[in-house]
Amino acid sequence: MLVELEDLGKSYFTEEVETRALRGITLQIERGEYVAIEGPSGCGKSTLLSILGLLDTPTAGRYRLNGRAVEKLSSSERATIRNREIGFIFQNFNLIGDLSIYENVELPLVYRGMTRRERRSRVEEVLERVHMSHRAKHFPMQLSGGEQQRVAVARALAGDPSILLADEPTGNLDTRNGEAVMDLLAELHEYGSTIIMVTHDARFAKHAVRAIGLLDGQLVDERIAASAL
């Protein structure tokens, strides 16, 4: 099992007031699954994704990632796992404007200490996979929103992560480009990628094999795509 959550909770405390962002989350995700976590703004989706991505820690319950008890890891151990095993796709793309598309995708590999030849091979491979090889020498401002999100997906893939976490990946896109990004994620899933996506849009949640509803910090329902039955 790749992801195991047991009675997971997250609370924030301010001036002796407790705000429970997540409560009683129990969930298992196997390697190779495509899961959408769907719910309205403020329901805890981004908090859950931050915990899954080791950017935040729960205040209750247990989280095991690839068999490791996350709550027992040090900050440096979490950072190492995050950098090597988790790919992030953000709503705002988070591309660096002064770097070319090639350089944006290459940057995480530089920090890993890969050789120039290794980096070139990997960058070319992932740009081809997201159909953006022809844009390698361009800069983010020269691309449409849909194209920038494709580059963001390529960057997330570059390190060959165990899991892709997508935070509202269609949030800044029109319907046509949003559907194109959803088609790309479905294609990556067919290649074997494990994908967990949070979205407020039921139309896009339907693209996942499993759609899990989140409301007021709690899991409320789960649906399996008809194609998976």
Locations of regions flagged by a protein language model:
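ABC family nucleotide-binding domain
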Residues: L2-L214
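Short amphipathic beta-strand/extended segments with alternating polar/hydrophobic composition
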Residues: K72, I224-A225
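ABC ATPase nucleotide-binding domains
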Residues: S227-L229
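H-loop (His-switch) and adjacent beta-strand-loop-beta switch element
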Residues: A211-I224
